[in-house]
């Protein structure tokens, strides 16, 4: 794994070794590439390494979804009846 290695150096290493090289920010001449999926999808706030390409910006939508979930749990509106399994009263009484 070659991470944050200048592309010409990564190319030299890739040509010089008999094992496959995997690049993360090491240019296109490695045998394979990897990106952290949270970085790819824009889920991380703040500074991203130069080699990260955002294929989507899901971070804000995910934070909003988690906030809405937490708010509904605290307010007691989730889970509602439609999100809960019911049970016949007679079957419940058999357990006591």
Predicted stretch roles:
Residues 6-31:
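Alpha-helix-loop-beta-strand connector modules within alpha/beta enzyme cores
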């Amino acid at each position: 794994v070659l991470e944050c290695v200048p592309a010409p150096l990564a190319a030299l290493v890739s040509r010089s070794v008999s094992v496959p090289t995997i690049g993360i920010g090491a240019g296109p001449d490695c045998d394979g590439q990897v990106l952290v999926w949270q970085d790819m999808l824009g889920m991380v706030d703040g500074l991203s390494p130069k080699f990260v390409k955002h294929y989507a910006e899901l971070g804000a939508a995910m934070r909003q979804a988690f906030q809405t979930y937490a708010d509904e749990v605290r307010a007691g509106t989730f889970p509602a009846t439609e999100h809960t399994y019911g049970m016949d009263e007679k079957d419940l009484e058999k357990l006591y």
